[in-house]
């Protein structure tokens, strides 16, 4: 056992000596299980191979069937073609015959015509004769001539009769030919029907085959899908395998590194080992008598040393784990990159393959798509250009901001660089410290390992010393170290080992590996074994790698070949298509040429040209057809090749799938085995880890007990030294103790006796079980033999049944053939009858013709009687009459004969038809009966199949029974193991008995309990045996029922056989009666033929002779059939005899075995399921093999059981010997205790010395560890500080970057919104301008036409304009709602709208009042004032731009100087100063230009007013909606005034409010900016068409995100708008000027800082820039 374990684990034999026996036993079990699993794997592989072979055989059979069906189809087609050719030939032959007959008829008709001409001549002659009655002389001549003519007439009549007879004969021939033709047609119809039936059959066969093929294809597709799924699963497994292999490689590398480090450490500490060897020598000399104390102290020191692990191991482990994770992540990244590369390569390959064969249509579609894409790309390019231009403009405006951002980023980069440098320095220091720590830890670990190894060596030495002492003491006391019993047992073992039959290889292995003289030799052999195993493993891996490579190469080659073939086929196809297209184009071009040339050519040359063209077309068509034929042939060939290729590919795929499935199974098995090995290893490690702890615990317990005993001994010695007088009192106590000990020994012996009794009972149970198992096996073998015998009987019966069936089939075929022949004869008779009827009709027609001719002749004779003498005519006429009467009589007699024949034939036909009908009915009834019987038999077959399935279902039960036996054997093994454990426990009990009675009693109770468990197990086994017997009885009952069914089916079959025989006898009787009737009919026909000797009768006679011949042939056939029947009956009798014999044998076999009658039920199913029988045979063979294997296993198990029993007996002997030795040792202990006292003092001295040395070393190590800990803690603290600093810097940098990103995002969003608003406003402007232009044109036309138009028209126009105004108002409201951003803005809007409505109402009223006054006044000074306004506006704008630029620069400088918190008072002062300055400037400019600004409301002045309104730099954003509304009203009022032909001066002074915005710090100074304008204007949209001011536009009620401080608290907006709009009308001179002033609002932030005051909606005052000195902004900048 130990040898096997050491061989399996590749471990030296000595290392297993320290392991306990139960552990070894478990290991041995696991190894046995592993070997069994390997055997099962091999069996499974064999089964898989067998299944594969069966599958391939089935596929080959299916292919053969397909090939046979295709061959049958081809043969049927060939037969069809042959029959068609024969038909065509017969048709042509009959046509020729018909043509010949037609020619003969034509000749006969011409002869008839000649006869008629002669008759006419005769008639004319008679007429001439009647005319020349007076000429007697001539009469004589005429008489002579008449006689001559009569003779000629007679001759001609004879000729006519001959012609008629010829014609009749020809007609008969014709009729016969027609009949033959009809027969041929009928035969043709029959053949066609057969062909149609055959074609139907072929169609059905094709349908079935196609369905079968479809099913096969579906299966193929399923298999392909399964293959794909398996392939994907294999890929997944391969990837996992790769990952695992990588991890394994990494682990191997780590192991190698560890081994290298270990070797280095060994080399380093080899010197120290040499130093400590001296110490070991001293210990060996001193520790001869102190082995127990040494072992205890060594264990204690080992424990102390094991507790001295450093605290830094956790940190190092974490670092190692992180490194491993890093490596794993890198490997995963590389793997993913490789996968991505592979996928891209595959996609490129697919793209290249798909882009190989583009067609012309695809190219055209691609060109169209590319054109569209080009157009889209151009549009996108233009859009991008426009966007780029806009972006460049925006960049020009935002250059200062970008510069500031760059500076900030540079500063941040500098800070980041500093922080990274700091980090690098910190990381370098950290790495250095880590390296130092790792080196120190390695040193500490090395020291600990050395200490541990030294301790182990010390322990080993102590044990060796102990063994030496024991051996020396044994040698001193006795001559040999072993007892005689031990020597005898050793000899037995050696003899038994020699008895085993070994192979040559095994003998060599035992010689080289098992037998050894020294431990060194054993170690050397183990090393050799390891090297051999590693070499073999490397060879195996290399072989597997080569196999994988070769397989991959083969697969790649096949795939490449398939791809090349497909590409070639596609190229050929494409070439053919191009050729066809070229030919089609040529044909079309020729047709077009023909059509064009036909129109141009002349009428004479048209025909010739057409002919030439037609020839060309025909030639081209012929070429086309030939090319098509060639192409079709090529295509067919290619298709065939493709099909062949596909088939081969399918075959390859199937083989590949099978291989891959097998591969997958093998891999799964490998994985399972690996898992099992890992599990075993884990269990081994657990057990190994458990063993030292267990040993340690036992040693501690023993040490404690020893220490206690020592203490007691000391105390006793002390008491003995003090109290020698009390020894007498202790003597009785000693005697009592001895008595107790004797009692314990007796109890022990009793227990041993009971154990032996239990073992004997157990052995008896085993023997019973083995005998029962042997009986069962014998029964199984007998059953198998019966099965084989019955199968052979079955096969013989099947053959007999097949022969009977073949006979029956031949009889049925013969009956069908006879029926077909009779039917054919009936048809031929019917055709003959029809022919005869036609001949009778012809004869009747001829008789009628003759009657007519007789009448004519009578008439002629009467006429002649009148003219000629009666004497001359009477004799001739009488002769003729007599001849005619004779002919008539003959004709009548013939007719009567024919009628009699027809009647007799009709009667015979009717009788035959009746008989045929009866026979058909009988046959139909029989067929129906047979069908019913067939259905019944099929049902019986299905039932029998079900029973067969049940029997087959019983087979796995038998297998389960066998498995159950195996399980029981395993249970027995487990029980044996338990018994061994029991024995071990009993040994422990024997040792504990010496110490304490109580322990012995408890162990005795536990053994009793375990004995109870054994008895329970025995009871369970008996129950299992009873269950098996019950199952056997069940199977027997099922077999009995199956046998009864077989008997029933046999009875049915006998009854059916009797019915068939009766039917055969009745059929034979019917055929004999028919034969008698046929003979009677033939005799009748012969009588009629004797009476009538015509040609027709001769034909009939020939027909009947043919029929007789056929009758004779049929009779001969009948006789042969009877002979065959007799032969079949004999066979049947022999079969019945054999069946009776078989039944007798069956009854005997039933009596003997009663289990093998079920299989006889398969005698009907074998014709259809021969293949299944073969499969069953194979399965049975496999089962027999498995049974044999199981029996062999059982035998092996029994052998092992016997071995174990022998081992148990040997162990029991050993137990007895050990007990004896224990008793000897107990005596020796007393001697050793006295020696112990002497050794104690020496040992204590040595231990003190060692302790002192070890204490010094320990103190040094502890000091070093504390120093290292201090360093580590300081380094960790420094690391933590640096990490905190770095995290802070990171956070600051990230916050700043996030803030800048948010600002940029906000700016971009605002820009996009403003652009959208700008686009909308521009669209509205264009729309309104278009409306204005339309209105102007309408007004001009109206001025020319409607000077004398009344005011009613003006009112209508006014209404329409008012409606338009209302619509525009609604649009304004929509626009306002869209631009509404906050609640404050909405309130402002509401106020503005109310004020706007009020102003509009007031102005409309004023306008209506002043309209009448201003109608008669003219508009003279328009141009002058417009020019002055434009020049003033431009100058003022330039000045304002210069001032704003200067102030922006000043504001930037002030901002650079002052970035700290400004107060609110300072902001208010700045706002008030700015307001005052703007108001003063506005007043000055108004005063300067007050005298010159008096002009009328026209287009130019309106536009100037608009521009001034919108170009005013200090106008607030909140006022703009009202300005827009005013502008729209103004535009709508202009055409009203022009309609009324206003020629007076109208002037309006617009005083618009100034609104200050608290957010943007914009001072509204529109009143200062606006000059006194004589027109009524409310302003312009947000931006003019010239400027793009939306780029810098900001909503005044939304805080700009460039200076938002997220940390600072939000301030409230105190908006106090005060709007005051005043209007004044000046007629000639402006006298009153209004100044609008607005209160300023508190502003917290400024939005954008653009350079142009026109483009921006905010003020560009430098004082306002100082608002950036807010505390919130300052805090943000500092952060």
From Swiss-Prot:
List UniProt keywords, sorted A-Z: Coiled coil, Cytoplasm, Cytoskeleton, mRNA transport, Nuclear pore complex, Nucleus, Phosphoprotein, Protein transport, Translocation, Transport
The Gene Ontology terms for molecular function here are: ribonucleoprotein complex binding; structural constituent of nuclear pore
The record places the motif (Bipartite nuclear localization signal 3) at 1433-1449
| UniProt motif Bipartite nuclear localization signal 1: location | 417-433
GO process annotations (BP) = mRNA export from nucleus; negative regulation of protein import into nucleus during spindle assembly checkpoint; nucleocytoplasmic transport; poly(A)+ mRNA export from nucleus; post-transcriptional tethering of RNA polymerase II gene DNA at nuclear periphery; protein import into nucleus; regulation of DNA-templated transcription; spindle pole body organization
Note, other? Present with 2770 molecules/cell in log phase SD medium.
Q: What is this protein called?
A: Protein MLP2
This protein's species is: Saccharomyces cerevisiae (strain ATCC 204508 / S288c)
């Amino acid at each position: 056992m130990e040898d096997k374990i050491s061989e399996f684990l590749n471990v030296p034999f000595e290392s297993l000596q320290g392991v306990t026996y139960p552990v070894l036993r478990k290991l041995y079990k696991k190894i046995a299980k592993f070997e069994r699993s390997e055997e099962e794997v091999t069996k499974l592989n064999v089964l898989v191979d067998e299944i594969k072979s069966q599958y391939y055989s089935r596929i080959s059979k299916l292919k053969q069937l397909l090939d046979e069906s295709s061959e049958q189809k081809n043969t049927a087609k060939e037969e069809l073609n042959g029959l068609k050719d024969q038909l065509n030939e017969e048709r042509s032959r009959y046509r020729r015959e018909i043509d010949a007959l037609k020619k003969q008829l034509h000749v006969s008709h011409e002869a008839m015509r000649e006869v008629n001409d002669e008759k006419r001549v005769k008639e004319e002659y008679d007429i001439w004769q009647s005319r020349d009655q007076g000429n007697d002389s001539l009469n004589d001549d005429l008489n002579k001539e008449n006689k001559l003519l009569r003779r000629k007439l007679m001759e001609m009549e004879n000729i006519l009769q001959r012609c008629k007879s010829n014609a009749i004969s020809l007609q008969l021939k014709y009729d016969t030919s027609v009949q033959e033709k009809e027969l041929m047609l009928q035969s043709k119809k029959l053949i066609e029907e057969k062909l149609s039936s055959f074609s139907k059959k072929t169609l059905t066969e094709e349908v079935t085959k196609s369905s079968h093929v479809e099913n096969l294809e579906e299966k193929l597709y399923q298999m392909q899908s399964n293959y794909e799924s398996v392939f994907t699963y294999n890929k997944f497994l391969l990837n996992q395998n790769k990952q695992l292999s990588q991890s394994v490689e990494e682990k191997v590398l780590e192991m190698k590194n560890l081994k290298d480090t270990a070797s280095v450490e060994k080399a380093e500490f080899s010197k120290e080992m040499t130093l400590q060897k001296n110490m070991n020598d001293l210990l060996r000399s001193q520790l001869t008598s102190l082995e127990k104390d040494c072992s205890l102290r060594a264990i204690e020191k080992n424990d102390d040393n094991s507790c001295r692990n450093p605290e830094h191991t956790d940190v190092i482990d974490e670092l190692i784990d992180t490194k491993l994770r890093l490596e794993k992540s890198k490997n995963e990244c590389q793997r993913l990159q490789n996968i991505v590369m592979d996928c891209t390569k595959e996609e490129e390959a697919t793209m290249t393959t798909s882009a190989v064969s583009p067609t012309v249509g695809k190219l055209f579609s691609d060109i169209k798509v590319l054109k569209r894409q080009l157009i889209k790309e151009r549009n996108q390019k233009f859009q991008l250009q426009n966007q780029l231009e806009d972006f460049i403009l925006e960049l020009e405006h935002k250059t200062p901001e970008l510069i500031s951002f760059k500076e900030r980023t540079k500063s941040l980069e500098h800070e980041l660089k500093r922080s990274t440098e700091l980090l690098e320095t910190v990381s370098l220091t950290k790495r250095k410290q880590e390296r130092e720590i790792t080196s120190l830890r390695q040193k500490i670990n090395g020291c600990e390992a050395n200490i541990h190894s030294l301790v182990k060596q010390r322990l080993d030495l102590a044990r060796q010393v102990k063994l030496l002492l024991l051996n020396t003491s044994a040698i001193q006391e006795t001559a040999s170290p072993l007892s005689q019993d031990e020597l005898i047992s050793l000899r037995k073992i050696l003899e038994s080992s020699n008895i085993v039959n070994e192979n040559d290889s095994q003998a060599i292995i035992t010689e080289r590996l098992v037998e050894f003289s020294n431990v060194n030799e054993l170690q050397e052999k183990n090393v050799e074994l390891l090297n051999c195993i590693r070499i073999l493993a490397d060879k195996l891996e290399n072989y597997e790698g080569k196999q994988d490579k070769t397989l991959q190469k083969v697969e790649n080659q096949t795939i490449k070949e398939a791809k090349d073939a497909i590409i070639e086929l596609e190229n050929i196809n494409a070439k053919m298509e191009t050729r066809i297209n070229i030919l089609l184009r040529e044909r079309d071009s020729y047709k077009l040429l023909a059509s064009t040339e036909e129109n141009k050519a002349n009428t004479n040359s048209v025909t010739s040209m057409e002919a030439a063209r037609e020839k060309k077309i025909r030639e081209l068509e012929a070429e086309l057809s030939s090319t098509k034929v060639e192409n079709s042939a090529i295509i067919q060939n290619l298709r065939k090749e493709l099909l062949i290729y596909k088939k081969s590919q399918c075959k390859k795929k199937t083989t590949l799938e099978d291989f891959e499935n097998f591969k997958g199974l093998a891999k799964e098995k490998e994985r399972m085995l690996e898992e099992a090995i890992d599990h075993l290893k884990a269990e081994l490690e657990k057990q190994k880890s458990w063993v030292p702890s267990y040993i340690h615990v036992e040693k501690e317990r023993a040490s404690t007990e020893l220490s206690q005993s020592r203490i007691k001994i000391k105390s006793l010695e002390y008491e003995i030294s003090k109290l020698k007088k009390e020894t007498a009192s202790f003597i009785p106590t000693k005697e009592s103790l001895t008595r107790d000990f004797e009692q314990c020994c007796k109890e022990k012996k009793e227990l041993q006796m009971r154990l032996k009794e239990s073992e004997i009972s157990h052995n008896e149970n085993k023997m019973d079980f083995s005998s029962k198992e042997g009986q069962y096996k014998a029964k199984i073998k007998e059953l198998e033999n019966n099965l084989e015998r019955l199968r052979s009987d079955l096969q013989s019966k099947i053959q007999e049944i097949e022969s009977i069936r073949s006979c029956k089939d031949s009889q049925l075929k013969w009956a069908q053939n006879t029926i077909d022949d009779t039917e054919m004869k009936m048809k031929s008779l019917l055709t003959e009858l029809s022919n005869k009827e036609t001949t009778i009709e012809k004869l009747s027609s001829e008789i009628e013709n003759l009657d007519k001719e007789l009448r004519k002749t009578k008439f002629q004779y009467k006429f002649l009687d009148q003219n000629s003498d009666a004497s001359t005519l009477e004799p001739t006429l009488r002769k003729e009459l007599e001849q005619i009467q004779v002919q008539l009589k003959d004709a009548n007699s013939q007719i009567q004969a024919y009628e009699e024949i027809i009647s007799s034939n009709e009667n015979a036909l009717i009788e035959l038809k009746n008989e045929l009908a009866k026979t058909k009915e009988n046959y139909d009834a029989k067929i129906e009966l047979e069908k019913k019987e067939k259905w019944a038999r099929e049902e019986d077959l299905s039932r029998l199949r079900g029973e067969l399935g049940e029997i087959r279902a019983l087979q796995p039960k038998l297998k389960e029974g066998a498995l159950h036996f195996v399980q029981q054997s395993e249970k027995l093994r487990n029980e044996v193991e338990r018994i061994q454990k029991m024995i071990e426990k009993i040994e422990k009990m024997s040792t504990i008995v010496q110490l304490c009675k109580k322990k012995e009693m408890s162990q005795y109770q536990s053994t009793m309990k375990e004995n109870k468990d054994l008895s329970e197990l025995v009871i369970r086994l008996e129950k299992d045996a009873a269950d098996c017997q019950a199952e056997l009885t069940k199977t027997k009952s099922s077999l009995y029922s199956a046998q009864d069914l077989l008997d029933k089916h046999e009875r049915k079959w006998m009854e059916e056989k009797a019915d068939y025989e009766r039917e055969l006898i009745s059929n034979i009787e019917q055929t004999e009666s028919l034969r008698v009737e046929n003979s009677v009919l033939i005799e009748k026909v012969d009588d009629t033929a004797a009476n009538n000797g015509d040609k027709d009768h001769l034909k009939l006679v020939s027909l009947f002779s043919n029929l007789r011949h056929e009758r004779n042939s049929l009779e001969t056939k009948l006789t042969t059939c009877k002979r065959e029947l007799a032969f079949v009956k004999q066979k049947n009798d022999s079969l019945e005899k054999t069946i009776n014999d078989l039944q007798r044998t069956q009854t005997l076999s039933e009596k003997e075995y009663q289990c093998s009658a079920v299989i006889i039920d398969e005698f009907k199913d074998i014709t259809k399921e021969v293949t299944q029988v073969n499969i069953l045979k194979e399965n049975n063979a496999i089962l027999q093999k498995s049974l044999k294997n199981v029996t062999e296993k059982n035998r092996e198990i029994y052998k092992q059981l016997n071995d174990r029993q022998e081992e148990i007996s040997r162990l029991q002997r050993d137990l007895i010997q050990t007990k004896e030795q224990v008793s000897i040792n107990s005596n020796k202990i007393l001697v050793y205790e006295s020696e112990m006292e002497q050794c104690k003092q020496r040992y204590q001295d040595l231990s003190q010395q060692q302790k002192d040395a070890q204490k010094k070393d320990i103190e040094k190590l502890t000091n070093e560890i504390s120093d290292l800990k201090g360093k580590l803690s300081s380094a960790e603290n420094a690391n933590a500080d640096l990490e905190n600093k770095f995290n802070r810097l990171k956070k600051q940098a990230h916050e700043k970057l996030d803030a800048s990103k948010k600002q940029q995002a906000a700016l971009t969003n605002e820009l996009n919104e403003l652009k959208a608003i700008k686009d909308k406003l521009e669209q509205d402007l264009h729309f309104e301008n278009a409306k204005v232009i339309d209105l102007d044109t309408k007004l001009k036309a109206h001025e020319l036409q409607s000077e004398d138009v009344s005011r009613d028209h003006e009112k209508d126009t006014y209404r329409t304009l008012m409606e338009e105004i209302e619509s525009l108002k609604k649009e304004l409201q929509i626009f306002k709602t869209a631009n509404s951003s906050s609640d404050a803005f909405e309130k402002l809007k509401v106020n503005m709208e109310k004020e706007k409505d009020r102003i509009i109402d007031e102005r409309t009223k004023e306008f209506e009042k002043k309209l009448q006054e201003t109608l008669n006044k003219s508009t003279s000074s328009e141009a002058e004032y417009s020019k002055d306004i434009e020049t003033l506006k431009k100058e003022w704008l330039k000045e304002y731009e210069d001032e704003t630029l200067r102030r922006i620069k000043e504001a930037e400088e002030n901002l650079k100087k002052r970035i700290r918190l400004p107060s609110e008072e300072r902001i208010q002062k700045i706002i008030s100063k700015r307001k005052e300055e703007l108001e003063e400037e506005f007043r000055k400019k108004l005063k300067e230009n007050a005298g010159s600004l008096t002009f009328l409301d026209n287009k130019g002045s309106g536009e100037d007013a608009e521009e001034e309104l919108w170009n005013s730099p200090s106008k607030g954003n909140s006022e703009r909606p009202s300005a827009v509304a005013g502008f729209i009203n103004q535009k709508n009022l202009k055409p009203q005034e022009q309609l009324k032909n206003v020629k007076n001066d109208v002037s309006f002074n617009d005083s618009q409010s100034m609104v200050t915005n608290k957010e943007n710090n914009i001072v509204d100074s529109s009143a200062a900016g606006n000059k006194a304008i004589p027109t009524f204007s409310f302003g312009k949209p947000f931006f003019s068409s010239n400027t793009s001011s939306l780029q810098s536009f900001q909503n005044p009620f939304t805080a700009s995100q460039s200076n938002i401080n997220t940390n600072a608290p939000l301030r409230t907006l105190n908006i106090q708008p005060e709007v005051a709009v005043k209007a004044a009308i000046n007629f000639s001179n402006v006298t009153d000027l209004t100044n609008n002033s607005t209160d300023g609002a508190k502003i917290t932030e400024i939005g954008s800082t653009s350079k142009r005051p026109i483009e921006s909606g905010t003020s560009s005052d430098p004082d306002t820039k100082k608002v950036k000195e807010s505390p919130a902004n300052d805090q943000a900048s500092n952060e």
